């Protein structure tokens, strides 16, 4: 067991466990703690603690400090998969989120019970990145996008083969969601068309439209684009979809199975044709070779105002990472290269570049 003394020694900070210090009887004021904190992080947060927080119970120092806190609160749940998915726990998490708390989604893997599933506390590195990203956004003191309508699409699409199989990609939607949160933080009215992912934006003010297939993504994107001032196409839309979809599970046969594919509709090209003079259209390009040339060609061909280039050659960038390294090219052929950063920081860089094009 890790004792308070061990934590105090390693962190070189006092460790508060109870209302009264066991050494000298001094009162640990939960009110002072609540007022002093810039951010309240509860990690790990058990089902018991989450339930008490949702109910407003204050029977220990952690809970009384939470009720006294005027700062942002981040909660990192950690429990067995069945406890996490229980309706009571989900209801409690919903209550906490609706009260403005930030929920750091638990990860999946081996649990203390020996089972495998969702419920592990997010990795410490991920929690730190969430906190850093939050404070990076808090540095924005103005609302330069106030009154602007921003449409963003994000995440993958899934193209069904039969009722149990589909074609998709590794996109987590993290980059597009970070863009939506950054735009909302700058005062924009944000609509997010989101493919099938587990992540959700932090801001409660974002209008999220959930879609699954490329066809649904296209329909929702076209509709959202009609009324927006700025569009950012961050979704990883499937380039191909099965020519036919079986309504029954395809059984394993003795021979090979051939799936005929047809191209999906090009959303960026369609919106480029629809674009009005007062609209700004931003695309993304994921390249493996001749990156700048290919991205510049896509920008011109699809009538984009700006394109964000990701290279699969860059370690720590692209799908499946919480970091990204981008190059931005605008229609005047200005090229801005950025270092590897968290996706929250990258989102802020992209929005700042957009601001130079709309003002």
Swiss-Prot record:
A single GO BP term for this record reads:
pantothenate catabolic process
How is the activity of this chain controlled?
Slightly stimulated in the presence of 1 mM Mg(2+).
Please give the annotated consequence of changing residue 113 to R: Loss of 80% of decarboxylase activity
- E.C. number: 4.1.1.-, 4.1.1.29
* Catalytic activity, reaction form: L-cysteine + H(+) = cysteamine + CO2; 3-sulfino-L-alanine + H(+) = hypotaurine + CO2
The question of whether Membrane is a record keyword is answered with no
A GO cellular component term found in this entry reads:
phosphopantothenoylcysteine decarboxylase complex
What does the UniProt note on pH dependence state? Optimum pH is 7.0.
What pairs make up the disulfide bonds?
A: none
> Which is one Pfam family of this protein?
DFP
Whether Magnesium counts among this entry's keywords is no
Q: State a single Gene Ontology molecular function.
A: FMN binding
Q: Which InterPro entries match?
A: CoaB-like_sf, CoaBC, DNA/pantothenate-metab_flavo_C, Flavin_trans-like, Flavoprotein
**What are the alphabetically sorted keywords of the record?**
Decarboxylase, Lyase
Q: What class of enzyme is it?
A: lyase
- According to the lineage, what is the superkingdom? Bacteria
Temperature effects on activity: Optimum temperature is 35 degrees Celsius.
Q: What family classification does the UniProt entry report for this protein?
A: In the N-terminal section; belongs to the HFCD (homo-oligomeric flavin containing Cys decarboxylase) superfamily. In the C-terminal section; belongs to the PPC synthetase family.
Chain's role: Catalyzes the decarboxylation of L-cysteine to cysteamine and of 3-sulfino-L-alanine (cysteine sulfinic acid) to hypotaurine. Also catalyzes the decarboxylation of various amino acids such as L-lysine, L-glutamate, L-asparaginate and L-proline. In vitro, shows highest activity with L-cysteine as substrate.
Q: Which NCBIfam families match?
A: coaBC_dfp
UniProt protein name: Cysteine/Cysteine sulfinic acid decarboxylase
- Origin organism of this chain? Unknown prokaryotic organism
Q: What is the primary gene name for this protein?
A: undec1A
């Amino acid at each position: 067991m890790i004792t308070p003394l061990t934590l105090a020694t390693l962190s070189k900070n006092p460790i508060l466990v109870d209302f009264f210090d066991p050494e000298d009887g001094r009162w640990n004021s939960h009110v002072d703690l609540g007022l002093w904190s810039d951010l309240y992080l509860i990690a790990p947060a058990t089902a018991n603690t989450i339930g008490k927080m949702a109910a407003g119970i204050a029977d220990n120092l952690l809970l009384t400090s939470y009720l006294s806190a005027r700062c942002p609160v981040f909660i990192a749940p950690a429990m067995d998969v069945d406890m996490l998915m229980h309706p009571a726990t989900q209801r409690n998490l919903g209550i906490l989120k609706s009260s403005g708390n930030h929920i750091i989604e638990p990860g999946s893997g081996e649990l203390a019970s020996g089972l495998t599933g969702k419920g592990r506390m997010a990795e410490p590195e991920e929690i730190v990145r969430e906190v850093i990203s939050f404070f990076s956004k808090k540095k924005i003191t103005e609302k330069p996008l106030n009154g602007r309508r921003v449409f963003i699409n994000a995440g993958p699409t899934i193209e069904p083969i039969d009722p149990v199989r589909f074609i998709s990609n590794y996109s987590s939607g993290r980059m597009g969601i970070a863009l939506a949160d950054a735009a909302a933080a700058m005062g924009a009215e944000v609509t997010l068309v989101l493919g099938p992912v587990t992540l959700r934006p932090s801001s409660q003010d974002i209008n999220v439209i959930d879609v699954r297939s490329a066809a649904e993504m296209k329909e929702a994107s076209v509709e959202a684009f009609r009324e927006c001032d700025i569009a950012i196409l961050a979704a990883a839309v499937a380039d191909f979809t099965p020519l036919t979809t079986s309504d029954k599970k395809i059984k394993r046969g003795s021979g090979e199975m051939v799936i005929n594919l047809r191209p999906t509709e090009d959303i960026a090209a369609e919106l480029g044709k629809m674009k009005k003079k007062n609209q700004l259209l931003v695309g993304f390009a994921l390249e493996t070779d001749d990156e700048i040339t290919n991205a510049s060609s896509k920008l011109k061909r699809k009538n984009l105002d700006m394109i964000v280039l990701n290279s699969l050659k860059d370690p720590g960038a692209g799908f499946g990472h919480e970091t990204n390294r981008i190059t931005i090219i605008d229609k005047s052929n200005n090229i801005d290269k950025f270092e590897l950063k968290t996706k929250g920081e990258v989102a802020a860089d992209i929005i700042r570049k957009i601001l130079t094009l709309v003002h």
